[in-house]
């Protein structure tokens, strides 16, 4: 599955403990990554500064659902459970 352009759920819902340019301590769950632009696109996509955890995340129907809202809800619940 390819990511839905403009979704951004994986850049909002989960906590990320790795440093991110502009967020040296990572980001807490539910906080929008500073690298997510106004169109919900990662400004680091394809760049070496992108955290490994972000690079390694692969979209899948179970997590991402059929809509951006489903993806955000699913990832928020997974974060809550961990």
From Swiss-Prot:
- Fetch the InterPro entries from UniProt: Puta_zinc/iron-chelating_dom, UPF0153_domain
- Which is a Pfam family this sequence falls into? CxxCxxCC
> Which family does the similarity line name?
Belongs to the UPF0153 family.
Entries under PANTHER family matching the protein: UPF0153 PROTEIN YEIW (PTHR36931:SF1)
What is this protein identified as? UPF0153 protein VC_1057
User: What species is given as this protein's source?
Assistant: Vibrio cholerae serotype O1 (strain ATCC 39315 / El Tor Inaba N16961)
Top-down, what is the taxonomic lineage of the species of origin? Bacteria, Pseudomonadati, Pseudomonadota, Gammaproteobacteria, Vibrionales
């Amino acid at each position: 599955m390819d990511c839905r352009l403009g979704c951004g759920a994986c850049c909002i819902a989960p906590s990320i403990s790795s440093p991110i340019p502009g967020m040296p301590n990572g980001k807490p769950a539910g906080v929008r990554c500073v690298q997510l632009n106004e169109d919900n696109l990662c400004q680091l996509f394809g760049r070496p500064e992108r955290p490994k955890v972000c690079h390694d995340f692969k979209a899948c129907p179970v997590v991402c659902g059929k809509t951006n809202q489903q993806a955000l809800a699913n990832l928020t619940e997974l974060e809550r459970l961990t």
